[in-house]
A protein has these predicted regions:
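Helix-loop boundary and gating motifs at the non-cytosolic
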Residues: 2-54, 214-240, 314
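Helix-to-loop junctions at the C-terminal end of transmembrane segments
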Residues: 55-72, 254-270, 353
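Hydrophobic core of transmembrane alpha-helices in multi-pass small-molecule transporters
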Residues: 95-114, 294-311
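Symmetry-related core transmembrane helices of the 12-TM Major Facilitator Superfamily/SLC fold
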Residues: 156-175, 359-382
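C-terminal transmembrane helical hairpin of 12-TM major facilitator-type secondary transporters
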Residues: 270-310
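A late C-terminal transmembrane helix in Major Facilitator Superfamily
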Residues: 324-354
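Helix-turn-helix DNA-binding segment
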Residues: 398-455, 460, 471-476
Length: 476
């Protein structure tokens, strides 16, 4: 069986490689499409590949349950993505390029969903989930930065992306084998636990569907907000107010790491509050830039908040997935919801930033109200219990469900078939340390009769002394 350290390292590496392959492939596809289409066409083409990736994220749950899926799904995911990357490099027709791109991002979406599910399994119950998520995101950003800065564009760039996808496939394949080896034990535990008494906390954790749906809505709303902030930055870049180069993307890696550390404080008790503060900061920066402040403010806040946002929605669904009935579907739902919004609202967000300060203010207030409602619905404004508080709660529930002393004594009497008179003698002897003569007087029978009943009780219960009988009867 794998140690938790190795499982965690493999899942971190897989998520980092997915981030690198996904972002790098998106950047490469946009650049290739830009040689064949005008800017408006590139935006539409990018929307289609992001939509295809969402389909891949959602399809993985069904693919993983097909017969013998453990053997061929990881291979198909990454081999298909590699083949499509090579096709994007070689094709010169826009339609063919679009088809290859959509197919490739469908496969990348499937691989990404599996990488997220592996991460959710490896870090289930871990107090370091957000730090792991932020580290994986930062590593993927750094790999993409190095690929863009130091690797020549074209064939060498594609070779690096294919190498990343191949490494991702290898990790997914071997982690699947390890997961299958442990599955029988997990199923046995699940069947055994199904017969136990259900406590209120168990009922809450089995299927938190309501919270999951609110979380999807929250990601969609926040994606609208950050898309608007991105529109402010993009518009300023296009007008020449600022120059958005490649190096500021390093702030994404740094903010992802910081977000992971901050979110994990006291087992993510304050993650919702921190993200709410980041949201407020983003709204203020949008209004400030629209009102005439330096666009650099929007740029700084955008890169700072984007790392927090990615770490937030990834951690939120990784934490939620193991408690859902179809965890493979929900582990990557944060990325899927973000991608849906990225290709559906980018044009509307950019148009909004060009509509004037009043329109932006109204939209910001509406987004704030919707986001606040979604934060509450997702339960992110309720402080979750710490490990110590959970232990105390579980101990209290166990004490409440444990049989009482009266129930234990009644079960003891029934088990050994004691008569009513023997029961009276047993209760008197076990609850009173006085000599048998005084107990006999209290019961209104002779000492000889008490001794006879006591002898019968010793024989039935296989005890030999009054002390031993008392311990058995009292359950001590």
């Amino acid at each position: 069986m794998l140690s938790i350290e190795r499982k965690s390292l493999e899942s971190l590496a897989a998520l980092a490689l997915f981030t690198f392959a996904f972002l790098g492939s998106e950047f490469f596809f946009d650049r290739r499409m830009g040689t064949l289409l005008p800017a408006e066409g590139v935006v539409g083409a990018q929307a289609l590949i992001l939509g295809a990736s969402v389909v891949g994220f959602l399809a993985f749950a069904a693919l993983s349950k097909l017969p013998r899926a453990q053997a061929w799904v990881p291979f198909t995911e990454t081999a298909g993505a590699i083949a499509c990357l090579i096709a994007v490099l070689m094709l010169d027709d826009a339609t063919a390029l679009q088809v290859a791109g959509c197919a490739g991002f469908f496969f990348l979406g499937c691989a990404g969903a599996e990488a997220h599910w592996n991460m959710a399994r490896a870090f289930e119950g871990s107090p370091s989930l957000a730090k792991g998520t932020g580290s994986a995101y930062a590593a993927g950003i750094l790999l993409q930065f190095a690929n863009n800065q130091f690797i020549p564009t074209g064939a060498w760039e594609v070779a690096m992306l294919c190498a990343g996808a191949a490494a991702l496939g290898a990790l997914l394949f071997f982690t699947r084998d390890d997961a299958n080896a442990e599955r029988h034990g997990e199923n046995a535990c699940t069947s055994e636990n199904a017969n136990t008494t259900t406590s209120p906390s168990t009922t809450e954790n089995v299927q938190p569907l309501n919270r999951a749906l609110w979380s999807v809505a929250l990601v969609a709303i926040l994606a609208c907000l950050f898309s608007t902030l991105d529109g402010v930055t993009t518009l300023s870049d296009a007008q020449g107010s600022i120059a958005v180069d490649e190096w500021p993307r390093l702030f994404l890696a740094a903010s992802g790491l910081v977000a992971g550390i901050v979110f994990d404080i006291r087992e993510r008790r304050y993650m919702g509050f921190v993200m709410f503060g980041v949201m407020l900061l983003s709204i203020i920066s949008i209004l400030a830039v629209e009102a005439g402040a330096s666009p650099v403010i929007g740029l700084i806040v955008f890169f700072f908040s984007s790392g927090f946002f990615v770490t937030f929605f990834t951690t939120m669904f990784l934490q939620l997935a193991p408690r859902m009935r179809t965890p493979q579907l929900w582990a990557g739902m944060g990325r899927a919801a973000n991608n849906v919004c990225a290709f559906t609202i980018s044009g509307a967000s950019l148009a909004l930033t060009q509509a004037g300060v009043v329109a932006v203010m109204i939209a910001s207030i509406v987004l704030f109200m919707l986001a606040s409602t979604a934060f509450i619905g997702a339960g992110l404004f309720r402080l979750p219990p710490t490990a110590r508080e959970r232990e105390v709660t579980e101990a209290g529930l166990a004490a409440e469900s444990a049989p009482s002393a009266e129930e234990l004594q009644a079960e003891f009497i029934a088990r050994y078939g004691l008569t009513p008179r023997e029961t009276d003698v047993l209760r008197a002897v076990a609850c009173d340390e006085r000599p048998l003569k005084q107990i006999a007087d209290d019961l209104g029978i002779s000492l000889r009769m008490v001794q006879r009943h006591l002898t019968n009780i010793y024989e039935k219960t296989d005890t030999q002394t009054r002390t031993g009988l008392t311990k058995e009867f009292m359950g001590k």
